[in-house]
Amino acid sequence: MSDALSAIPAAVHRNLSDKLYEKRKNAALELENIVKNLTSSGDHDKISKVIEMLIKEFAKSPQANHRKGGLIGLAAVTVGLSTEAAQYLEQIVPPVINSFSDQDSRVRYYACEALYNIAKVVRGDFIIFFNKIFDALCKLSADSDANVQSAAHLLDRLVKDIVTESDQFSIEEFIPLLKERMNVLNPYVRQFLVGWITVLDSVPDIDMLGFLPDFLDGLFNMLSDSSHEIRQQADSALSEFLQEIKNSPSVDYGRMAEILVQRAASPDEFTRLTAITWINEFVKLGGDQLVRYYADILGAILPCISDKEEKIRVVARETNEELRSIHVEPSDGFDVGAILSVARRQLSSEFEATRIEALNWISTLLNKHRTEVLCFLNDIFDTLLKALSDSSDDVVLLVLEVHAGVAKDPQHFRQLIVFLVHNFRADNSLLERRGALIVRRMCVLLDAERVYRELSTILEGEDNLDFASTMVQALNLILLTSPELSKLRELLKGSLVNREGKELFVALYTSWCHSPMAIISLCLLAQAYQHASVVIQSLVEEDINVKFLVQLDKLIRLLETPIFTYLRLQLLEPGRYTWLLKTLYGLLMLLPQQSAAFKILRTRLKTVPTYSFSTGNQIGRATSGVPFSQYKHQNEDGDLEDDNINSSHQGINFAVRLQQFENVQNLHRGQARTRVNYSYHSSSSSTSKEVRRSEEQQQQQQQQQQQQQQQQRPPPSSTSSSVADNNRPPSRTSRKGPGQLQL
């Protein structure tokens, strides 16, 4: 230390710690000349002693002015060393960097100034301290003192220039440092970081694109910054990187795709738009690299399809179509199960557009990878069934298409119909709201006859009789009114003529027995008029309830529609279709006379021509809907000399059918009685005690009143007593008839 003091005059030593900047500056200039002379003479030991003295007595001094003098002195030494400074940097730079965290803002300012002067001298040799300097500058960029920020900004610009010129800069060592600070929220630090990313990316020899996954998330995080300038800088940097990706032959799409998927769900609109735009480009460019990320990408796209921002919706739809058009196989790593899982989750979305696209994906996978989809059927089947209750008709129609695609296999067809019936049973509102839509669409997508036969088979063994009746009534109404089932109606019209119609009639009859009106409608459709009349005659008082009359009202109105045109035309020949008339009159007799349906049917029957009755015997008693040209080859159910209903026609044993109908109806009647009895007993048991108690109280009151009257009345004579007895109205006892018990 004495060597250092001998080399430095006392005045210089004293002025370095002076409170006046000018004195410190002059002392530093003198120190610079001293070091130059020592360098020229090659006295490296003295130079080291001088540096050591500046650090120990000045830079580390508790006095702020001493620390300021030490910093300016170290800068002066570096300038004096000039080209020889590199070998002393290990001594000079660390204390300057440490001063960046000094509590005194003026010391921090002079530290920036000192390091700036040092960097100007040593240039590229300065790189070995880059990470420490970068860390210090990152903190100084957010310094509370504006002067320190300004000085740090100047130093930062110089360091950037040095780095871009240097071939010693290590991007591999720098990236972890950058990544560690990318999530800092301070706006000044963010500007500092984006500035460095942009500068380094502009250097041809530095491959920032290869390290983009390490700091991409941080850049996206800045897109939602409150500062417009920071958002703009981050967006500019991202746009530049995206352009580089388009022009680069090799990019790590996978790691970045994971980040983009998360950012696509950001609450910030600008961030979502940028993320979905990147995903769109990745899907176009990524190719095989993205196969295993398709499920994650789809999970990000589907919600964006329903985004409130139109730009996001447009890009999301484009990306969705692009992704769906890619042809990949499970052997390439395409995970069908993962895609199905995403689609299943999105079926619960609150947005209709997202649910529709999720169903489109399931349908696409079913067409392209049927075997794999069926392996995961149990995972998605319940969700698909629940979707039948969706509030959107478009969603329901798409769900039915998916179900129809699955039901191409016989075992899945049966399973589908069973589950449909189960859902209708579990949710009564589903049958009311969606029943017609579901059944009609299933009849279009799958064979209508096949669907109705399967439904009939299932309902035939239904234990819940009320549900079976309701379901059959719904199916019957669909059968009578839906354009999609016109071929089925035509087939049933020939039930008495051809085998196919007969088999369908018998298949439906078994379950249609749950509803008298459905059976009557089926017979009218099949032109089995005698059997319809017999069914009407078999009805009892219990069957004619409000529900029955409502169904009858619907049928009467349907008779006036084009569907039953053939039936109305047959009324032109009442002699030939006597059983049809008897059936219609039977329905008329069941209707209340003041009802609209009664008036409609009565008006129709009034139009039946009477002249045909006189020729009825000549035409013959062919009372079915079978064409007369075929009559002599038929034996219609109503065309028997003895009107024997126990005969059969074309294999249809109507006697057995009638017995089957009555058996089912007896079950319904028994259940109705049980329900009424249960309701009666449950209500009477709760009130019987109260009624009994009330009666006892009334009897006690009557006895008390009678006693009071007897006490007040004078004793009667025998004459007056007999007169009074004659004038008194007869008692309940005197009014009892023969064999009547006294109450």
UniProtKB/Swiss-Prot annotation:
Subunit and interaction comment: Component of the PI(3,5)P2 regulatory complex at least composed of ATG18, SAC/FIG4, FAB1 and VAC14. VAC14 nucleates the assembly of the complex and serves as a scaffold.
Location(s), subcellular: Cytoplasm; Vacuole membrane
Gene3D superfamilies from the UniProt entry: Leucine-rich Repeat Variant
Any one GO cellular component localisation term in the record: PAS complex
Protein name (Swiss-Prot/TrEMBL): Protein VAC14 homolog
Keyword terms, alphabetized: Cytoplasm, Membrane, Repeat, Vacuole
GO BP annotation list: phosphatidylinositol biosynthetic process
Protein task: The PI(3,5)P2 regulatory complex regulates both the synthesis and turnover of phosphatidylinositol 3,5-bisphosphate (PtdIns(3,5)P2). Regulates the synthesis of PtdIns(3,5)P2 by positive activation of FAB1 and by controlling SAC/FIG4 localization.
Biased composition (Low complexity): 678-688, 697-712
SUPFAM superfamilies: ARM repeat (SSF48371)
